[in-house]
Amino acid sequence: MIVIVAYDISDEDRRGRLRRYLRRLGLARVNRSVYAGPGTATTAELVAERAKEIVEEGDSVFVIVVREDEYQRAHVFDGRDYYIVSERKYEVY
């Protein structure tokens, strides 16, 4: 399973706290405000609990768990290019 976390947090200190926590869990930055990595529903729950402690009004954090094959079918648009994750052999490990 792959845990994906997308966030919009206005304060740099709070963003940094969440980023450091996500890295400790083994998630990697895949976009400016998106982290992904191997995990389980329990990992997602841990992220959600930590996010509740960090976010304030106006902030948002989105946490989802998908199967790896679903993640590999993700479509990516990066402003210059478009690709499907599996075509780039892109991994979050």
Curated annotation (Swiss-Prot):
GO molecular function: metal ion binding; RNA endonuclease activity
Chain sites annotated for binding Mg(2+): 8
UniProt superkingdom: Archaea
Keyword Ribosomal protein among UniProt keywords: no
Any one Gene Ontology BP term: defense response to virus
EC number of this enzyme: 3.1.-.-
NCBIfam families: cas2
Record's function text: CRISPR (clustered regularly interspaced short palindromic repeat), is an adaptive immune system that provides protection against mobile genetic elements (viruses, transposable elements and conjugative plasmids). CRISPR clusters contain sequences complementary to antecedent mobile elements and target invading nucleic acids. CRISPR clusters are transcribed and processed into CRISPR RNA (crRNA). Functions as a ssRNA-specific endoribonuclease. Involved in the integration of spacer DNA into the CRISPR cassette.
Protein name stated in the entry: CRISPR-associated endoribonuclease Cas2
